[in-house]
Regions:
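Structured mid-domain segments that build the active-site/substrate or prosthetic-cofactor binding neighborhood
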Residues: 6-123, 127-130
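Catalytic domains of carbohydrate-active enzymes that cleave complex glycans
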Residues: 64-65, 90-230
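Active-site lining segments of carbohydrate-active enzymes
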Residues: 2, 6-9, 14, 144, ...
Length: 230
């Protein structure tokens, strides 16, 4: 598929009619190998809102003689922020069965992947995707899921108070998993790293696009902490 496909939408949506017809026209000739994109290749720190749409796109590929479905992720970057881990989980399930219910997959992931911190991480995720859905549905082309898009990297799209609130959810999630330290079996470390990973997106936005709101000493300290955690 084209890198200009709007992956925040499904192939059933009118905005992707050209790509939809392209796949449909190929399928009579044999097995179709689908290559979709689920990242913003300009900047891995900024989310690409394909979570729900990818489920329908897997189903579309399946009914159009799809034999192999590949979702492009982050090259040689196994641990990435913006809930990329959830995308990997969705792909792993949908590769097996395209009929899985999205809501069930979402619940299973957030109930387990972040341990007791999952409640706050789900809150972060819900606010993030709802905001991006709103921006997309308001007709803002910068949020339509095109894989090559540098236009979402501005302070106006990511207000500092929103970024601080999302980062605070991660802090609250980290507090929730403190009790697992007593297990002394690596559980705490695994959960800690998974939650810390999701702080990178809001912290990156704050450090890069809201730096003027802090003193030179403050922003230098914040950037060093960000660097140390990546």
């Amino acid at each position: 598929c084209s890198s200009k496909t709007r992956y925040a939408y499904t192939f059933w949506d009118d905005i992707n009619v050209i790509d939809k017809e392209q796949i449909e026209n190929w399928q009579p000739f044999g097995s179709v190998y689908d290559f979709f994109y689920e990242i913003n290749s300009n900047n891995y720190f900024v989310p690409c809102n394909t979570f729900r749409a990818c489920v329908e796109n897997y189903r579309f590929a399946k009914i159009n003689n799809g034999r192999l479905m590949t979702s492009m992720g982050n090259w040689k970057t196994p641990y990435t922020t913006s809930f990329t881990a959830f995308k990997s989980y969705l792909n792993s399930r949908l590769w097996v069965n395209v009929n899985y219910d999205y809501a069930d997959l979402e619940k299973t992931f957030f109930d387990h992947y972040y341990g007791d911190g999952g409640v706050y991480m789900k809150k972060f995720f819900d606010e993030m995707t709802s905001y991006m859905d709103y921006m997309r549905d308001s007709g803002n082309a910068d949020f339509n899921g095109v894989v090559v898009n540098e236009f979402t990297y501005t302070a106006k799209y990511w207000p500092i108070k929103m970024m601080q609130r999302w980062n605070n959810y991660c802090d609250l999630a980290l507090k929730e998993i403190e009790k697992t330290k007593a297990l002394n079996d690596g559980t705490y470390e695994a959960l800690h790293d998974r939650i810390l990973m999701e702080t990178l997106f809001p912290r990156y936005i704050i450090c890069k696009y809201h730096a003027a709101k802090f003193s030179e000493t403050e922003i230098a300290s914040m950037r060093k902490a960000f660097y140390d955690d990546t």
